[in-house]
Design a protein with these regions (language model features):
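Active-site beta->alpha N-cap acidic-glycine motif
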Residues: 20-88, 115-117, 124-131, 224, ...
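Structural recognition of the beta-strand scaffold that forms the well-ordered cores
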Residues: 29-33, 56-60, 88-93, 125-131, ...
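Charged helix-capping and loop-helix junction motifs
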Residues: 71-77, 106-110, 211-217
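C-terminal domain-boundary segment and adjacent tail
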Residues: 20-21, 66, 119, 151-160, ...
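Catalytic domains of cell-wall/extracellular-matrix polysaccharide-remodeling enzymes
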Residues: 41-44, 49, 70, 98-185, ...
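Short, solvent-exposed loop/turn segments at secondary-structure junctions
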Residues: 37-39, 63-65, 94-96, 134-136, ...
Length: 261
């Protein structure tokens, strides 16, 4: 009996690996995500991503109260153009709502507004979500499951481990103009089956300077990733590596881990 238990403990990580991973996670795998739909994501970010041939996911919302100000935020035609450029458009709620304070009906309304807007513009069905302000709770995960979302991104300033992190609690680092050393150090953690995900706001961010990433710093990150031969993808492309249904089945959501930035 003791020998069987020892054998099971030795084999369990291999079994888990085989069930959750469709393909091995390569070292130097990075996901770039962009929140809140500031105007600079269209004018600065998208052209630079194209220049470097990098993927990315844009989590869009209508950030109240100034979302209609084209000097601050993208309009829906620009968001449509991001999709046409080959980038993923994903859901960040209608009004940048704290989903931990919403009923299921309220949450569904927030999600459906963005879904319907995208559908009207020919943008493919949205499958991924990011928690505005990193506000979340266990109910939010249940609501996302009911709506058939695949991945949901939080914060936490740590690498994503598909063998231990629930697909609705994917951690990320957030960039700003002060944490260059932290972000460069974070890239080093993209190894041994772990994936580094960045949350980026405006480049620059005029309305929310505390999450501002200067364009020259953003380009420096892209250059670092290119020179050091990182693979840079969207959230959606994680499905090439991860069996999400198995990950949901095998991982209980762990709210004791850090989930905000």
């Amino acid at each position: 009996m003791k020998n069987r238990l020892t054998l099971y403990l030795l084999l369990f990580p291999l079994i888990l690996h085989a069930q959750i991973l469709k393909n091995p996670i390569p070292d130097k795998l990075v996901v770039l995500t962009f929140d809140d739909a500031p105007a600079s994501q269209y004018s600065v970010v998208a052209p630079l991503l194209q220049e470097y041939d990098f993927g990315g996911t844009f989590f869009v919302c209508e950030f109240q109260p100034n979302y209609a100000d084209s000097a601050l935020y993208m309009n829906w035609r620009q968001i449509q153009e991001l999709d046409r450029m080959g980038f993923e458009v994903a859901n960040h709620t209608h009004t940048h709502a704290n989903v931990s304070k919403l009923s299921q009906a309220e949450f569904n309304k927030q999600l459906s507004y963005i879904e319907d807007k995208c559908d009207s513009l020919g943008i493919p069905k949205l499958t991924n979500f990011a928690y505005p302000g990193y506000g979340l709770n266990s109910q939010a995960l249940e609501f996302l499951e009911a709506k058939d979302y695949v991945f949901a991104r939080a914060g936490g300033s740590r690498a994503y481990d598909p063998l231990s992190d629930h697909p609705y609690l994917i951690p990320s680092w957030a960039t700003d103009e002060t944490n260059k050393a932290e972000i460069l150090s974070a890239f080093d953690q993209a190894k041994d089956g772990k994936i580094v995900i960045l949350t980026i706001h405006g480049v620059p961010d005029i309305e929310h300077p505390w999450v501002n990433t200067p364009p020259e710093l953003f380009k420096e990150y892209l250059e670092y990733l290119k020179v050091n031969e990182f693979t840079v993808i969207s959230m959606k492309e994680l499905e090439e590596y991860i069996d999400v249904d198995e990950a949901k089945r095998l991982h209980k959501p762990d709210f004791s881990k850090k989930l905000s930035n």
